Every structure is written in C-alpha cells, then in structure tokens.
Design a protein with these regions (language model features):
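Q-loop/switch helix immediately C-terminal to the Walker
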Residues: 95, 100-117, 124-127
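Catalytic Walker B motif of ABC-type/P-loop ATPase nucleotide-binding domains
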Residues: 166-170
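Conserved ABC ATPase signature
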Residues: 141-148
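Helix-to-loop junction immediately C-terminal to a conserved catalytic motif
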Residues: 73
Length: 216
C-alpha cells in the first residue's frame, strides 16, 4: 500500500525514472504534492502503474481522490513533483460529457473521432456500446438515458478511446450489481491486453493484484 506522506519504493511496480518521466510505466507519480483551497490534499506521493497494472485510490470523502485523478489526467497542476508515464490516458469522471441532444451513438462517435486511435471510430463505438450493454439504445438521445445508462455510456466512451491508461473517478456510482460486474470484466480485459487503470472509489470494485494508494 502506498501512503501519500510516504514515498513508495520499487515494490509497488516500476519506480518512476530518475528524470520523472516514469519510463516503462503507464503512469508514474514522483513526490507529487497537491494543494487546493489552501489545504494540502496529499504530499510527496510516489507510485507507478505498469502496463497491465492497476492502482486503487482509497480514503474518506473529501480527502482528494478526485483531485488525484485530475492530476493524473493533466487537468490539475500539482504544486510540486512530477507526473509522467508512457500511456495515453482517458478519463471517466462524474459527468459523461456527452452532447445531450445527440443520439448516443453519434455523441460517442464525436469523441471517438478525436481519440488516440484514429481507425474506424464508428466501429469502435459500436463495439463499446455492445460491451456495456447499450447497443439497443444507440439511437436514443443522450438526454433520455437513465442515470445508470449515462454511467455506462461514459464507460463506453472510455472503452472506445483506444487509450492505454483508464482514469476512472467513482466509476461504480449509479451502477447496479450487474453493471459493476460488467465494469470489472471490462477492466480485466483492458489489463489483459496491456492496458492500465487508476481507479478512485469509495465503493467495492474487484481489482485483482491492484496496489492501493491510501489518502488521508
């Protein structure tokens, strides 16, 4: 287990490279400190996630789990330390970030066309919709989706991206038991193909052999 106030050693996977790029790791934090609103959320945090690996960010509500995900995504700048890694990353946050007026398929295709994997965006979207069990509502406007369907649509966006590193912020929120099992299967398939995941959650998710990053 990695704790924010104690830099981790190499037992948690490939250590971040000396130049801070985390060469060989999908994601690497080296001595990262994050401050928001004058409050230190985590300090001198170091860990690395190798290809095929997983890290589970845990801790009480408000401790900084979502901020850590945002730092990993490049959306929040740490006050010190370095964030690196070889993998292209994609983010699943609380909001699906899909055009509510468009049919689900077209809303996902908009993002798929911009993603790291340029080939066959329509095909990638179709496969992702099938994977999350939403193929039957592909032509339904996003605004008409239920909360659980919107969460699965957000996951479909991640699946269709082709990114090597999935950054998942509370991915089980709004999902029933069957959908959480589906999420776990998709993560397992992604990891088996060499992909990596960083998951922040307060709900139980099965992540075999995942390292734990404890905040708070």
């Amino acid at each position: 287990m990695v704790q924010a106030d104690q830099p981790s050693g190499p037992s948690f996977g490939p250590a971040p490279a000396a130049d801070g790029t985390g060469e060989g790791a999908a994601l690497a934090f080296r001595d990262v400190t994050c401050v928001r609103g004058g409050r230190v959320l985590f300090e001198r945090l170091s860990f690395a996630v190798p290809p095929g690996g997983a890290a589970l960010v845990t801790g009480p509500n408000g401790v900084g789990k979502s901020s850590l995900i945002r730092v990993a995504a490049g959306l929040l700048r740490p006050v010190s330390g370095e964030v690196g890694g070889a993998a292209v990353r994609t983010l699943m946050g609380e909001a699906a970030a899909l055009d509510s007026a468009r049919p689900l398929r077209r809303a996902l295709a908009f993002w798929a066309a911009l993603d790291v994997e340029p080939a066959d965006p329509q095909g990638r979207v179709a496969r992702a919709l099938h994977a999350v069990g939403l193929a039957h509502i592909a032509e339904v406007p996003v605004r008409l989706l239920s909360t659980g369907q919107r969460r699965r649509a957000a996951l479909a966006r991640v699946v269709a991206s082709g990114a090597g590193l999935w950054l998942l912020d509370e991915p089980a929120n709004g999902l029933d038991v069957a959908s959480v099992a589906m999420l776990e299967r998709l993560i397992a398939v992604h990891r088996a193909g060499g992909g990596a995941v960083l998951v922040a959650t307060h709900l139980p998710i099965a992540l075999p052999d995942a390292q734990t990053v404890m905040l708070g």
